[in-house]
């Protein structure tokens, strides 16, 4: 330090205040920076490009079911590492990491609640838990939810988002395709409606079983739906796939699903479908939500 700098007055600068974490969210599609409160009010749909941001199951069911009496079902059914499976990491360590990151015990949550006053059973997958994969506990939770619907003669709704069967459980995970299909056949015997909602992504063994067995199959816009992913298919057939292949709009155009519905309209749409399928009076919808 020279004599000149010693003569200069010291200038204090105000501490720079950072923006609190979680106030803003960047859209994964258009990269617009969105105010978190406004985004949540819009049900996690980007107001700029209408991209449907992935939801955890509790947030999804909180948006879907009426406030008030809600009962979680089958939460005591937990995953078990029967095969002592290990790839680059032990399966039990993967489970522990997923449980810590998501604060959930498994990749499926099941609730009994109401939709515009009408009781239903609803299930939702968690893509943030081991890719929403279906293992023995997921299949058992799903079956328990359907059995509860049968017992109380209620409609059943499932929101799927999954990479498929959980490879760390081997054949035990593949058994769940048959189990979930069989229990849904029982639901159909009682003439109780099953509404399947496909969200991004719904792939593999889940898409090949419970996801495509709905009396009405609905998809959120631009959801990736299929068995193998498009990159795997292109590498196998050595051809470029059509634009939009395996997206919900493509599947609707080719008759694989029944409807593509914006998330903000799902509750009113499903409520109307259920009343039609169960021969009940139309639900008392708010004016802005009427379909």
UniProtKB/Swiss-Prot annotation:
Molecular function per GO: acetyl-CoA carboxylase activity; ATP binding; carboxyl- or carbamoyltransferase activity; zinc ion binding
Listed GO biological process terms: fatty acid biosynthetic process; malonyl-CoA biosynthetic process; negative regulation of translation
Keywords of the record: ATP-binding, Cytoplasm, Fatty acid biosynthesis, Fatty acid metabolism, Lipid biosynthesis, Lipid metabolism, Metal-binding, Nucleotide-binding, Transferase, Zinc, Zinc-finger
Functional pathway: Lipid metabolism; malonyl-CoA biosynthesis; malonyl-CoA from acetyl-CoA: step 1/1
Main location class: cytoplasm
UniProt subcellular location: Cytoplasm
Keyword presence, Lipid biosynthesis: yes
Top-level EC class: transferase
Binding residues for Zn(2+): 27, 30, 46, 49
Limits of the CoA carboxyltransferase N-terminal domain: 23-291
Domain of life: Bacteria
Reaction catalysed by this enzyme: N(6)-carboxybiotinyl-L-lysyl-[protein] + acetyl-CoA = N(6)-biotinyl-L-lysyl-[protein] + malonyl-CoA
A Pfam family per the record: Carboxyl_trans
GO CC terms of this entry: acetate CoA-transferase complex
Note on how the cofactor is bound: Binds 1 zinc ion per subunit.
C4-type Zn finger ranges: 27-49
InterPro entries in the record: AcCoA_carboxyl_beta, Acetyl_CoA_COase_Trfase_b_su, ClpP/crotonase-like_dom_sf, COA_CT_N, Znf-ACC
Role of this protein: Component of the acetyl coenzyme A carboxylase (ACC) complex. Biotin carboxylase (BC) catalyzes the carboxylation of biotin on its carrier protein (BCCP) and then the CO(2) group is transferred by the transcarboxylase to acetyl-CoA to form malonyl-CoA.
Assembly information from the UniProt record: Acetyl-CoA carboxylase is a heterohexamer composed of biotin carboxyl carrier protein (AccB), biotin carboxylase (AccC) and two subunits each of ACCase subunit alpha (AccA) and ACCase subunit beta (AccD).
Family: Belongs to the AccD/PCCB family.
PANTHER family attached to this UniProt entry: ACETYL-COENZYME A CARBOXYLASE CARBOXYL TRANSFERASE SUBUNIT BETA, CHLOROPLASTIC (PTHR42995:SF5)
NCBIfam families to which the protein is assigned, alphabetical: accD
Record HAMAP family: AcetylCoA_CT_beta (MF_01395)
Name the UniProt record assigns to this protein: Acetyl-coenzyme A carboxylase carboxyl transferase subunit beta
Gene name linked to the record: accD
């Amino acid at each position: 330090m020279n004599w000149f700098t010693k003569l200069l007055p010291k200038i204090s600068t105000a501490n720079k205040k950072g923006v609190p974490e979680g106030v803003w969210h960047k859209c994964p599609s258009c990269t617009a920076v969105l105010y978190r409160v406004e985004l949540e009010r819009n049900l996690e749909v980007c107001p700029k490009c209408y991209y449907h941001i992935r939801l955890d199951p509790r947030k999804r069911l909180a948006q879907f079911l009426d406030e008030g009496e809600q009962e979680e079902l089958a939460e005591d059914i937990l995953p078990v590492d029967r095969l002592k499976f290990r790839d680059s990491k032990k399966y039990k360590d993967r489970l522990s990491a997923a449980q810590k990151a998501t604060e959930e015990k498994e990749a499926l949550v099941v609730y009994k609640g109401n939709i515009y006053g009408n009781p239903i059973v609803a299930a939702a997958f968690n893509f943030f838990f081991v890719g929403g994969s279906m293992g023995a506990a997921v299949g058992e939770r799903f079956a328990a939810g359907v059995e509860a619907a049968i017992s109380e003669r209620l409609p059943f709704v499932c929101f799927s988002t999954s990479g498929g069967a959980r490879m760390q459980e081997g054949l035990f995970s593949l058994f769940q395709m048959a189990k979930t299909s069989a229990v849904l056949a029982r639901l159909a015997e009682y003439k109780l409606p099953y509404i399947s909602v496909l969200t991004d992504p719904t792939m593999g063994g889940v898409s090949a079983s419970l996801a495509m067995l709905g009396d009405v199959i609905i998809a959120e816009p631009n959801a990736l739906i299929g068995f193998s992913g498009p990159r795997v298919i292109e590498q196998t057939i050595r051809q470029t796939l059509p634009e939009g292949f395996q997206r919900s709009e493509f599947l609707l155009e080719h008759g694989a699903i029944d409807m593509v519905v914006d998330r903000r309209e799902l509750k009113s749409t499903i409520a109307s479908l259920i009343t039609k399928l169960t021969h009940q009076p139309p639900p008392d919808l708010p004016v802005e939500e009427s379909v």
